[in-house]
Amino acid sequence: MSHNTFGHLFRVTTWGESHGAALGCVIDGCPPGIIFTLAEIQAYLDKRRPGQSKYTTQRQEQDQVELLSGAITQEDGTTFVTTGTPISLLIRNTDQRSQDYGKIAHQYRPGHADYTYDVKYGIRDFRGGGRASARETAARVAAGALARKVVPHLVVRGAVIAIGPHHINRDRWDWSEVENNPFFTADAEMVQIFSDYIRKIRKDGTSVGAVIEIVAENVPAGLGAPIYAKLDQDIASLLMSINAVKGVEIGDGFAAARLRGEENADEMRMGNDGKPLFLSNHAGGILGGISSGQPIIARFAVKPTSSILTPRRSIDVDGHDVDVITKGRHDPCVGIRAVPVGEAMVACALADHYLRHRGQVG
């Protein structure tokens, strides 16, 4: 199985399976001299970590990150500085229950990667889905924590804007609310609505999807390149690589198709500070594949979790019709924990393009 690496100069390889001994990542190309602490990485992992609320999977993983290489400890014993060599980060699995998956060892879960993995490789890891499990994304979040430090002053934030049919009101958007609720939403009035809905979904033995918005600020103008190295192309690619993601849009995205040309164009004037000023941001901070200096805005849609208690029709490995019920501990809405993963993917794309831009034009 190849294709476990992404990036050009800031290259990340993830490894490990949902029910293996551990998982982790190797970051190749991180510049020397980046100062960080494991606590900084841990903060993002804790945001993604399972078992933190009744609205996510009850699998209990501490997700404690371990640094194996690529940085030197400073005198205080907690601060590290990168050396420019490959950085290896490890996260141990401690709460696997592979016995929960015994029955589906010979069945294909509808909507999951079971069938396609089997068709392609002739073998699959049925224990929690192996590499197809959202557990793999913990390694991405760890890499994203360091990626944020590559681009000076970069701020990448995400929020859930919809769960199932329930959408936030953008007039009530408040970033300070995101860390104060289990749904990572910026609309405080939607917390109870989301809560009631997820409780019903879980009671019904099923799952639901979500839409997440990622905003990157302080992105310098000029990142990306025309045609085959567009910044939005790479952001979309990395967001699409996240488990269960089925759609991505940049800026107004599909809504732009309903606008007239004069409505969609981001007009410009010179600001009082002598710098170009955009009067809108329909493009989501990227024009012609190159960052404009405006905030980069991306959204992605996460489908309902495939592993549910509701019986579904499928087949087994011998070609017999079966009804599948998936036991185990699963997210009723995996989109909730996808917020820090989306942030990490955007941060990694920006770090990679920042280094490529610096290497090309200085």
Swiss-Prot record:
GO biological process, one term: chorismate biosynthetic process
HAMAP family in UniProt: Chorismate_synth
Cited SUPFAM superfamilies: Chorismate synthase, AroC
Subunit structure and binding partners: Homotetramer.
InterPro entries per record: Chorismate_synth, Chorismate_synth_AroC_sf, Chorismate_synthase_CS
Lineage: Bacteria, Pseudomonadati, Pseudomonadota, Alphaproteobacteria, Hyphomicrobiales
Protein name, as recorded: Chorismate synthase
Cofactor: how bound: Reduced FMN (FMNH(2)).
NCBIfam families cross-referenced by the UniProt entry: aroC, PRK05382.1
One GO molecular-function entry: FMN binding
Keyword Magnesium applies: no
Presence of the UniProt keyword Amino-acid biosynthesis in the record: yes
Short name of one Pfam family: Chorismate_synt
Reaction equation(s) it catalyzes: 5-O-(1-carboxyvinyl)-3-phosphoshikimate = chorismate + phosphate
Species annotation: Bartonella tribocorum (strain CIP 105476 / IBS 506)
Biological function: This reaction introduces a second double bond into the aromatic ring system.
Residues bound to FMN: 131-133, 243-244, 288, 303-307, 329
Positions bound to NADP(+): 48
Keywords: Amino-acid biosynthesis, Aromatic amino acid biosynthesis, FAD, Flavoprotein, FMN, Lyase, NADP
Record-stated family: Belongs to the chorismate synthase family.
Enzyme Commission number(s) from the entry: 4.2.3.5
Pathway: Metabolic intermediate biosynthesis; chorismate biosynthesis; chorismate from D-erythrose 4-phosphate and phosphoenolpyruvate: step 7/7
Annotated GO CC locations: cytosol
